[in-house]
């Protein structure tokens, strides 16, 4: 069927309107977007409707009800520890527990393996002079002064005079036990000296210093002191040498005497007469436990005397007697 000219003209008009509408859409979108309709076509033409732009959003609706609580999730990793809080108050003291059973007595490990003298300490690497603990043959611990510097070291000092701070004119009991101060003058005690020298052989060294600072010494090959039952008898070996000379050999095999126990061979009490305590014979050639008389003195033989060096009227400033295993 042929289309009439009028129909074709109307179709072209519709297309032209659509073209112009589409071309103007960007500009209209910037301002408004009115609804576009094409209606009223005559005859057999179909009705064509063009949809306009969306309208403005409406007002938000009311808030809905909360949903059902979901399942609990898995536990997360622990967080970093926080700062420590302030220290709380001290708690009450608890009740005292029950006393344990007494253990079996055993030998001290220190006694079994500990040092026996200062030479033993030196051999173990103790090179500093000073006070150390050693163990006597009966396992008694004893604190002694070790001379690690003189003549190769390893000397156990049992007598020291240095400043007159300690009274050496004492009785038998005091010399038996020992007396004095670690910081100054002392006598180690006849029981301890006996224990130190009873086992094996020990050499003796005597060191003397006068008030002019001159040093002298004397050495003996062996030295032992017997026990109290033998009145601490001196058993002395040969004089080896030394700048002080020999002032002790004459006391060999003599008993120890004090002002209250006269064991010498003199008709008088030498300890009382010369105000000391020593292995007096018919009195002495040395008196290192005599009075501290500050060098030259007018009195006779009652100072810290070593007659072979300075006679009987000079009292030494420093005296040390020491032993070492031979």
UniProtKB/Swiss-Prot annotation:
Glycan attachment positions: 305
Comp. bias (Low complexity): 77-89
Sites where the protein binds Ca(2+): 262, 264, 266, 268
Effect of residue 300 to F: Abolishes interaction with all sialic acid-containing glycans
MF annotations from Gene Ontology: antigen binding; carbohydrate binding; carbohydrate derivative binding; G protein-coupled receptor binding; metal ion binding; pattern recognition receptor activity; sialic acid binding; signaling receptor binding
Segments traversing the membrane: none
Effect noted on mutating residue 250 to F: Inhibits binding to the 9-O-acetylated sialic acid derivatives
Protein name: Ficolin-1
Record organism: Homo sapiens (Human)
Highest classification ranks of the organism: Eukaryota, Metazoa, Chordata, Craniata, Vertebrata
């Amino acid at each position: 069927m042929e289309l009439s000219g009028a129909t074709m003209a109307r179709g072209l008009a519709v297309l032209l309107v659509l073209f112009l509408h589409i071309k103007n859409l960007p500009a209209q979108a910037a301002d408004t977007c009115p609804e576009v309709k094409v209606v009223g076509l005559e005859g057999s033409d179909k009705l064509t409707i063009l949809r306009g732009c969306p309208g403005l959003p409406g007002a938000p609706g009311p808030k809905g009800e909360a949903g059902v609580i979901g399942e609990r999730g898995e536990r997360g990793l622990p967080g970093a520890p926080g700062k420590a809080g302030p220290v709380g108050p001290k708690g009450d003291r608890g009740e005292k527990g029950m006393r344990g059973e007494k253990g079996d007595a055993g030998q001290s490990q220190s006694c079994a393996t500990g040092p026996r003298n200062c030479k033993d300490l030196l051999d173990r690497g103790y090179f500093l002079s000073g006070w150390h603990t050693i163990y006597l043959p009966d396992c008694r611990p004893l604190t002694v002064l070790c001379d690690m510097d003189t003549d190769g070291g390893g000397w156990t000092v049992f007598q020291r005079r240095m400043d007159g701070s300690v009274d050496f004119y004492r009785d038998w009991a005091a010399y038996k036990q020992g007396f004095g101060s670690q910081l100054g003058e002392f006598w180690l005690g006849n029981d301890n000296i006996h224990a130190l020298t009873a086992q094996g052989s020990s050499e003796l060294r005597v060191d003397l210093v006068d008030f002019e600072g001159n040093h002298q010494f004397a050495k003996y090959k062996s030295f032992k002191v017997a026990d109290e039952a033998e009145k601490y008898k001196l058993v002395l070996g040969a004089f080896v040498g030394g700048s002080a000379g020999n002032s002790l050999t004459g006391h060999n095999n003599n008993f120890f005497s004090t002002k209250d126990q006269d064991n010498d061979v003199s008709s008088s009490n030498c300890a009382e007469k010369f105000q000391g305590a020593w292995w007096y014979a018919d009195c002495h050639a040395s008196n290192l436990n005599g009075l501290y008389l500050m060098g030259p003195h007018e009195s006779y033989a009652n100072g810290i005397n070593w007659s072979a060096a300075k006679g009987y009227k000079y009292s030494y400033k420093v005296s040390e007697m020491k032993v070492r295993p031979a």
